[in-house]
């Protein structure tokens, strides 16, 4: 699901809200979450999961084109840990790519 699809679905489910208001709410939420993570804060949404930063230490990489070794600096990357309720909800789901041909 893309951000545009999410906005469209929310607009249909909440008919009393204007599409522009839903668009603003979704974009504001994502902006606030990105801002919190960029300040090093942890975001926890009970039943869904938590977002935090994980440190990736410096390492030696390789330029795939030349094969030359390249020193890569350490960095922080976003990390999502699903909550218990979300894990239970998706435990029995089979992704469409693994289902094979739907017409069978």
From Swiss-Prot:
Spell out the InterPro entries in the cross-references: Hist_DNA-bd (IPR000119), Histone-like_DNA-bd_CS (IPR020816), IHF-like_DNA-bd_dom_sf (IPR010992), IHF_beta (IPR005685)
Top-level taxon in the UniProt lineage: Bacteria
MF terms (GO), sorted A to Z:
DNA binding; structural constituent of chromatin
Its cellular-component GO annotations read: chromosome; cytosol
A Pfam family this chain is assigned to: Bac_DNA_binding
A GO biological-process term: regulation of DNA-templated transcription
User: Keywords, A to Z?
Assistant: DNA recombination, DNA-binding, Transcription, Transcription regulation, Translation regulation
Q: Which family does it belong to?
A: Belongs to the bacterial histone-like protein family.
Q: Assembly and partners? A: Heterodimer of an alpha and a beta chain.
Q: NCBIfam families, alphabetically?
A: hip (TIGR00988), PRK00199.1 (NF001222)
Its biological function? This protein is one of the two subunits of integration host factor, a specific DNA-binding protein that functions in genetic recombination as well as in transcriptional and translational control.
Specify the protein name: Integration host factor subunit beta
- Organism for this UniProt entry: Xylella fastidiosa (strain 9a5c)
